[in-house]
Swiss-Prot record:
Protein's UniProt name: Methionyl-tRNA formyltransferase
CDD domains (alphabetical): FMT_core_Met-tRNA-FMT_N, Met_tRNA_FMT_C
Cross-referenced InterPro entries: Fmt (IPR005794), Formyl_trans_C (IPR005793), Formyl_trans_C_sf (IPR037022), Formyl_transf_N (IPR002376), Formyl_transf_N_sf (IPR036477), Formyl_transferase-like_C_sf (IPR011034), GART_AS (IPR001555), Met-tRNA-FMT_C (IPR044135)
Family, per entry: Belongs to the Fmt family.
Record GO terms (molecular function): methionyl-tRNA formyltransferase activity
Keyword Transferase: yes
Coiled coil location: none
Classification of source organism: Bacteria, Pseudomonadati, Pseudomonadota, Gammaproteobacteria, Lysobacterales
Catalytic activity annotation: L-methionyl-tRNA(fMet) + (6R)-10-formyltetrahydrofolate = N-formyl-L-methionyl-tRNA(fMet) + (6S)-5,6,7,8-tetrahydrofolate + H(+)
């Protein structure tokens, strides 16, 4: 089976490894090298690094819509194109090239959380369950029929980074299972997505990281987890803007205004929210590294409040 693999970030690497064990990967498509780091040097994508290490041909077009790119894909004669977090929309002309179409591994239980940030939005919304889907691609954004899926609970204190790593491995396993069926002549049966329950996971932005104490503590705790490791939640704490790497929601009755420090100890800094309180456990001052609440309080003697 001849497969073209298209993917870019870390999430796609386990799937690429999985495909190489099941089929002949004739080409890997990934986004062009991007400037990164303080020196703004061009850096290859994680998928490119993996593909090069495996001796696979790598292509990095700016677009797949040009006649030259379409002809290049046709010459490769793929039976199937596998897409995992590629970051480039495949035009219908590309979708029509492989005999078996194009498959996509998506990090949610479709139709919930179509779009660019399904992992973060699931945690932000307080979802207790998510999963991965293997989808037959069509022209719409994550609208294609679902071939297979795997479910998993979202753990109470799980961050987006932690869930990302679990779902990446689950997606690779799901893809391997699907390819195994296809090779055996047992094509997975496409199940159309239901119109009910569609939600969209729009791309994360840095401005979202700024938390507002005028929200319930439970929602803020979910956002702290959702925005870890990027863009990392930010709050104003007694006049200082700090980043929050870990926090807990407290079901606490109080009559204090939102943003008021209620208690501060080595366990954490409890801040009043419009409903409940948020305990800040790991913080980061501007220009510093993430530290415990105890270490932060050593530098902020003005916050030495006791419960």
């Amino acid at each position: 089976m001849r497969i073209v693999f298209a993917g870019t970030p870390d999430f796609a690497v386990p799937s690429l490894r999985s495909v190489t064990q099941r089929a002949d990967v004739v080409a890997v498509y990934t986004q062009p090298d991007r400037p990164a780091g303080r020196g703004r040097e061009l850096m290859p994508s994680p998928v490119k690094l993996e593909a090069v290490a495996r001796g696979l041909p790598v292509y990095q077009p700016q677009t797949l819509r040009s006649p030259e790119m379409l002809e290049q894909l046709r010459v490769l004669r793929p039976d199937l194109i596998v897409v995992v977090a590629y970051g480039v929309i495949l035009p219908e002309a590309v979708l029509a090239i492989p005999d078996d179409g194009c498959w996509n591994v998506h990090a949610s239980l479709l139709p919930r959380w179509r779009g660019a940030a399904p992992i973060q939005r699931a945690i932000e919304a307080g979802d207790t369950e998510t999963g991965v889907c293997l989808m037959q691609m069509e022209a719409g954004l994550d609208t294609g029929p679902v071939l297979m899926s795997l479910k998993t609970p979202i753990n109470a204190h799980e961050t987006s980074g932690q869930l990302h790593d679990r779902l990446a491995e689950m997606g690779a396993q799901l893809l391997s299972d699907g390819l195994g069926l296809l090779r055996a002549g047992l094509r997975p049966v496409p199940q159309p997505q239901l119109a009910a329950g569609v939600t969209y996971a729009h791309k994360l932005g840095k401005v979202e990281a700024r938390l507002d104490w005028e929200q319930p503590a439970e929602r803020l705790a979910c956002r702290v987890r959702a925005f870890q490791p990027w863009p990392v939640a930010e709050v104003v704490l007694s006049g200082e803007r700090v980043r929050i790497h870990e926090a807990l929601a407290l079901d606490l009755d109080h009559s204090q205004p939102p943003g008021k420090v209620l208690a501060a100890s080595k366990e954490g800094i409890d801040v009043a929210c419009v409903q409940g309180a948020l305990r800040l456990c790991r913080l980061q001052r501007e220009g510093g590294k993430a530290i415990t609440a105890a270490d932060y309080l050593n530098a902020r003697r003005d916050l030495q409040v006791r419960a």
